[in-house]
Amino acid sequence: MLRASAMRAAVLHLTVALAALLSSCTTVSCLKIVPEEKQLILAEGSSLSLTCAGSSETTWDLKSDDVPFFQMKAESSDLNYKIVQSNSTASVLTLWHVDWKNTAVYQCREQLTGEIKEVAVFVPDRFSPQTLRFIESSHGMVTKTSGESTVPCVVTNPNITVTLYDKDTDLPVNGVYVPSEGFKAYLDYRTYVCRGELNGEVKESQAFNVYSIHVPEDIDAYVNASQTVLKQGEPLTVNCTVQGVELVLFSWDIPNRDIVKHKPETVVLSATTMRSCLVFPHATVAHSGTYVCHAHESTQDQKAFASVNITVLERGFVAVKSTRKQNITAELQENVELRVEIEAYPPPQIRWKKDGAPVRGDKTIIIRQEHEIRYVTILTLVRVRTEQKGLYTALITNEDDVKEVTFALEVQVLARIKDLTDHHLPGKKQLVTCVAEGVPTPTIQWYSCDSMLKCNNQTSLWQQLKADPELLSIHTSVTEARQTNQVRSQVTFFKPQHTTVRCETTNQEGLIDFRDVKLVSSSLFSQVVLLAVVLTLVPIIIMSIIILIAVWKKKPRYEIRWKVIESVSQDGHEYIYVDPIHLPYDLAWEMPRDNLVLGRTLGSGAFGRVVEATAHGLSHSQSSIKVAVKMLKATARRSETQALMSELKIMSHLGPHLNIVNLLAACTKHGPLYLVTEYCRYGDLVDYLHRNKHTFLQYYLDKNQDDGSLISGGSTPLSQRKGYVSFGSESDGGYMDMSKDEPAVYVPMQEQMDTIKYADIQPSPYESPYQQDLYQEQGGGRVDLVISDSPALTYDDLLGFSYQVAKGMEFLASKNCVHRDLAARNVLICEGKLVKICDFGLARDIMHDSNYISKGSTFLPLKWMAPESIFHNLYTTLSDVWSYGILLWEIFTLGGTPYPDLPMNELFYSPLKRGYRMAKPAHASDEVYEIMKRCWDETFEKRPDFSFLVHCVGDMLTDSYKKKYSQVNETFLKSDHPAVARTKPRLSSPFPIANPAFGSPSLVGLSDFPDPYNQNTRRFRNEAEVQEGVTSFNEYIIPIPDPKPEKS
């Protein structure tokens, strides 16, 4: 009690004295310590009060050799000092019961100006005041600089005489000794000791080793933790690392210091890297907070700090956020992306469900960790269908919490009128019934007009019908089905009408469908009908027969798109094609039907289907291989059978090539016609790009952090980078061709000729992710025909696809073969990113495919057709070059639909005639886009040929890729592949190599382009022919002269 009173009195006395002192301080330096002594000698067990005041807040620091900058706490129960903030600018440091351990330099720092004042305190040993004592240094190291260095041999009594000696030679060193700091001298890289002498007693200090260290201009500290979010009981490690300096001292500010016990450990990682570690084997909630690491380099007095925030949870959590509305409306065939952002710890399990059942089939699910506790999951529905509407739920769980997000998806189907009929009811009533379908449920409005001729051009003359008890009644009913909603509306006229009635339906603003029906009175109607029946019965029958024949002839028929050119006119604008019916068929292609085991349907169209099958006995090296079998439907007409037979003859005469879907065998006898071709397990290129788009974007999102690899506005084209391409087996997703959600039904092969029923074959689900070993055991894989095994879709892959398609088209052009439907949907992906060109029209419902537009009895892919094909019905290999440019646009937009800004109606033609061309895709380099523009030259003679395109695209590829392609091609041609083996006796294809000028820009046409790519066109083609290793001849096709370009 007396001690406390005395201390308060001393503090009051010092405060009054200090106030008087500060009243006279200048504006330059107001920081003062009272008492104003540079050093104080205290008796052991005594007390001391030091008051520091300035013009702003002041703090007390302890300066020592081991901890050059250690901020003292305001209060501490386990230490013999206390700091009291007497006012906003003054603080008092009180020491009591001091001993030799309190020997140190105490610093007062003004926060606003950074000014420092210090006082040295010495406490000699009370029991033996004359005893020599050095303050031990924990490291015994001295850093050498260009000037003086300080050996920190600090004593507890300033009266001790201290001398510095070289430990090895025992020779004294000249210098200056400061009791509170140590011995200052010019030192070498040696070991030194201090000797103290007092009243005849001599004692040596510990040894100090002098080191030379690299001192950077400034230092940076980096703090990281094993986890910034964790649960209590889990281990926690916090590291503070400093690089580029050889020696640095660490100190930590940690949360809840009174509760959390810590003992930092310093580790030297390398000659210029040090780390301080805090290790807590079992973290608690008290460990939550901000950890601040202070690093100090004492040679140049450089300081740095860094911090990290740690959160220790009592239990785990899950928090979710959807990035779009949860009630979603999508148009038919639109791609829908459902995205959920998640914060969770521990790491969550994420599952998607549709209407309570696990999601499977043609949906792409991405789960990506974006931060330590942040995740994102994306469910993508590609080309959404009506049956895919419903509730999609993302279920996120971990061991402590469960959350879910549900999206209600409605697939919008444009309203259309399905049926409009009128009936005469008893009592001279008339009933008009209109049936409309759509999603959301469409509305129906009724209108009438007395003059049909006038109303056709004057929509304002139509009068809306409303229910009237005396004239008419309107009754409407709605039926909701799984795929679409149906509305049935009926108008009943109570009196005979002689008018035109219109049914109009809509379910979207501005989009209306309507139909008209003309009503006549019942009496007049009966007379007209009777007279018509009597007078025109026979003519009607005759006309009906004629109409049926005409309709039957106009009905779209299956036809092979590929055409083989026989001859061309001198001006290059008239072509004669070979009639495939006149080509012979070699029975060597025949295979027994019982060697085929049919499986699931890969694709189905209006005319036929393609079925997966297992073929036995086609190859000597494999007992069975997986194949695709083309066949017609049971309703096929003779002309369609002839078309499929023509396709067989053309494919058999073309010969094998690595980049076309090759013919393997055929069954033409004793049953339906089968074409057995290669099986491409990853489907068409459009779906492949859609399904792997996320790997492309994620790959370059990761790489952008290092070298900005993704092609965009001003970035460096990837074509200028020679990247490494590895080769192995494909494993990027396992997607099947043309597959659906329904389970597959496998159909065994039967020897029942025409009695086989294929209607039961159902579309298959997508295969599970690729498993190479299993696939090879089934006989479907060829490990020596693999281009790339990269699981991600890269820019090099896009170039590789373009290159392989150009190689395949170069082969077809060399055979005078025009594809006429070159598009990404007709390019299939096989094992190892091997690309093959095909004509998949048989298994595609082109009558309901928006990519094909009806014209007469055929359907045309307008967006991919060259102008001369659209407007003049002229098809050449150069019109295929135009289509190749569109295919490049598809590839480098990752599966985009061409001409997204143009409608598919009569407005499509005008921009094309005016020279409209699509803009550069986001992922295409300038070189690739330049090739596209060359392919889209309006004058077809000026377009490059495929040999030139192979050269251009090949120049953008790495040498390793082209070398691997050549090795794969050579392996293919030397293998016992069924397509190669069946043509080896002939040594070549029956079609000749095209005339060097055919189907390519002549020298006159190319002279308009002073581009080095357009030189030596014949040389490119000749080199390509040598690489293919196939000598061509053909007795059916006459040589084709050079086309002459039009003169301007």
UniProtKB/Swiss-Prot annotation:
Protein modification: Ubiquitinated. After autophosphorylation, the receptor is polyubiquitinated, leading to its degradation.
GO cellular component, one term: receptor complex
Pfam families noted in UniProt: I-set, Ig_2, Ig_PDGFR_d4, PK_Tyr_Ser-Thr
Keywords (A to Z) from UniProt: ATP-binding, Cell membrane, Chemotaxis, Cytoplasmic vesicle, Developmental protein, Disulfide bond, Glycoprotein, Immunoglobulin domain, Kinase, Lysosome, Membrane, Nucleotide-binding, Phosphoprotein, Receptor, Repeat, Signal, Transferase, Transmembrane, Transmembrane helix, Tyrosine-protein kinase, Ubl conjugation
GO BP of this protein: angiogenesis; cell chemotaxis; positive regulation of smooth muscle cell migration
Reaction(s) the record says it catalyses: L-tyrosyl-[protein] + ATP = O-phospho-L-tyrosyl-[protein] + ADP + H(+)
Glycosylation sites: 87, 159, 224, 239, 309, 327, 457
InterPro entries attached to this UniProt entry: Ig-like_dom (IPR007110), Ig-like_dom_sf (IPR036179), Ig-like_fold (IPR013783), Ig_I-set (IPR013098), Ig_sub (IPR003599), Ig_sub2 (IPR003598), Kinase-like_dom_sf (IPR011009), PGFRB (IPR027288)
Activity control: Present in an inactive conformation in the absence of bound ligand. Binding of PDGFB and/or PDGFD leads to dimerization and activation by autophosphorylation on tyrosine residues.
Residues annotated as signal peptide: 1-30
E.C. number(s) listed in UniProt: 2.7.10.1
Membrane-spanning parts: 529-549
Enzyme class: transferase
Top-level taxon: Eukaryota
Similarity field: Belongs to the protein kinase superfamily. Tyr protein kinase family. CSF-1/PDGF receptor subfamily.
Name by which UniProt lists this protein: Platelet-derived growth factor receptor beta
Species per Swiss-Prot/TrEMBL record: Takifugu rubripes
Lineage: Eukaryota, Metazoa, Chordata, Craniata, Vertebrata
